[in-house]
């Protein structure tokens, strides 16, 4: 073993022990050796994170099938759209989950090592990665009930038998912070009897058990496979919920941060142009903690920004936004904020905690409801529920304001929102549906019963081409205006 390999092994072992303090050292050592073997030939980190982005960086957020034409794969259509319309302004593309999935529009994954053939292939992703940095979701927290792993869990077969979290009646869940309303623990009949599995986000999405170090080793292998396929930005989805301990909030626990530190360490070794992004839809100070000491996320989402900009523009009151922006610490060298105004999810309300008081928050929710928003709720420890997110497109959210009750200036308000965002420190990210000023897709909600579908409309390429070729269409005007702003 060379001196470099010895150093890597020590680093892996130390970080694994920090997570699994009660696991036999022989097991930890064996995992470190297997991971080290996978890293064989990796070069010493050298490029430096600060060189991976600059003031011109901009991220597009899109589903793999946001655009279809019935001829090419949706992924190929997306790549063609970016090359044709966004070549000079977008350098990175976040392609939302493209794996075989049973729900949540891709976030209930059956197989992390496959691309859903209805969307395209790994080759499509590799082709796109030749000219753009690709962000992919590492959905660490949970997997589909229909996955091979979960069938193994039910049947008592390895490795899946040890991959999912089930708890007994002695596990105290009274302090758990929830993002949803359904029952947290769901009964499942297995070969060894009935078990209660942990389901943070839906009954179809069963949480993994990261107290099993072999599961973490599995995900390390998956992450390295992603990098091999050209993925350079790893989005750790819902990572704050990863580790569970009885009697705690089961959110932002020490082991969760330690796992992120291990992933960062391995990614830096394997490919030093890899960027780690944590998706933690939390109050501001909790979100900031995911920078760690420069050893966790390269980027964190600026989750407080969307609701604060909405409040400013809807009520002609920038005081809260101004105070918040002045209080935000500058990102340290090698890290950055990821600024966004909309995404495939709704507008989170938890990031407004400590920024908007209850009266201000309710005022915002009332206006959003008047503008057509739906709301998703979460269960609280005291048995009540509260709004977790507002489900709406950004364009519809800004439809009518105090100063413009008829909505005549909606497009101007929409562009102003992005002008504000582009002027802030951080990397801007634009959701595909916002890029073309999409309005609330209520038909999608009606057909699916899913409130989030209001902002997840998909588009035919021919329809989109017609709109964007018409210089007088709203879609064309907004797109060209946003592109112009990005070049300033």
What are these model-predicted stretches?
Residues 2-488:
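Active-site and adjacent substrate-binding regions of carbohydrate-active enzymes
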């Amino acid at each position: 073993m060379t001196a470099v390999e010895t150093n890597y092994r020590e680093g892996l072992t130390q970080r694994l022990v920090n997570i699994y303090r009660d696991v036999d050292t022989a097991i930890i050592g064996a995992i470190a050796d297997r991971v080290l073997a996978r890293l064989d030939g990796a070069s010493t980190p050298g490029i430096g994170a600060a060189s991976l982005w600059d003031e011109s960086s901009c991220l597009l957020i899109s589903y793999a099938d946001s655009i279809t034409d019935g001829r090419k794969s949706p992924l190929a259509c997306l790549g063609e759209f970016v090359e044709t319309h966004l070549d000079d302004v977008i350098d990175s593309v976040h392609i939302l989950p493209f794996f075989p999935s049973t729900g949540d529009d891709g976030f209930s994954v059956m197989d992390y090592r496959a691309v859903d053939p209805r969307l395209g292939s790994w080759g499509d992703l590799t082709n796109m990665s030749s000219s753009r940095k690709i962000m992919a979701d590492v959905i660490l927290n949970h997997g589909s009930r229909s996955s091979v792993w979960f069938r193994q869990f039910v049947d008592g077969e390895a490795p899946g038998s040890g991959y999912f979290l089930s708890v007994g009646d002695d596990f105290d869940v009274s302090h758990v912070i929830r993002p949803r309303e359904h029952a947290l623990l769901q009964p499942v009949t297995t070969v060894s009897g009935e078990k209660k599995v942990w389901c943070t986000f839906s009954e179809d999405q069963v949480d993994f058990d990261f107290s099993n170090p072999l599961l973490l080793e599995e995900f390390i292998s998956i992450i390295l496979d992603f990098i091999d396929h050209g993925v350079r930005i790893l989005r750790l989805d819902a990572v704050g919920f990863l580790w569970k301990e009885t009697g705690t909030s089961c959110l932002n626990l020490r082991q969760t941060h330690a796992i992120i530190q291990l992933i960062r360490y391995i990614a830096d070794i394997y490919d030093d142009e890899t960027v780690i992004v944590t998706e933690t839809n939390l109050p501001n100070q909790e979100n900031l903690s995911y920078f760690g000491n420069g050893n966790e996320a390269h980027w964190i989402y600026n989750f407080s920004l969307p609701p604060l900009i909405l409040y400013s523009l809807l009520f002609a009151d920038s005081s809260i936004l101004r105070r918040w922006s002045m209080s935000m610490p500058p990102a340290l060298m090698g890290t950055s904020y990821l600024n966004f105004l909309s995404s495939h999810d709704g507008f989170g309300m938890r990031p407004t905690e400590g920024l908007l008081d209850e009266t201000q928050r309710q005022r915002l929710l009332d206006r959003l409801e008047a503008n057509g928003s739906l709301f998703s709720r979460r269960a609280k420890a005291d048995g009540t529920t509260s709004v977790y997110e507002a489900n709406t497109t950004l364009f519809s959210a800004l439809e009518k304001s105090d100063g413009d009750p008829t909505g005549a200036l909606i497009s101007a308000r929409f562009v102003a929102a992005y002008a504000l965002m582009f002027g802030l420190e951080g990397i801007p990210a634009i959701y595909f549906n916002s890029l073309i000023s999409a309005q609330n897709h209520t038909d999608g909600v009606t057909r699916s019963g899913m409130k989030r579908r209001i902002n997840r409309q998909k588009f035919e390429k021919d329809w989109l081409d017609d709109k964007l070729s018409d210089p007088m269409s709203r879609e064309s005007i907004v797109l060209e205006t946003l592109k112009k702003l990005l070049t300033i």
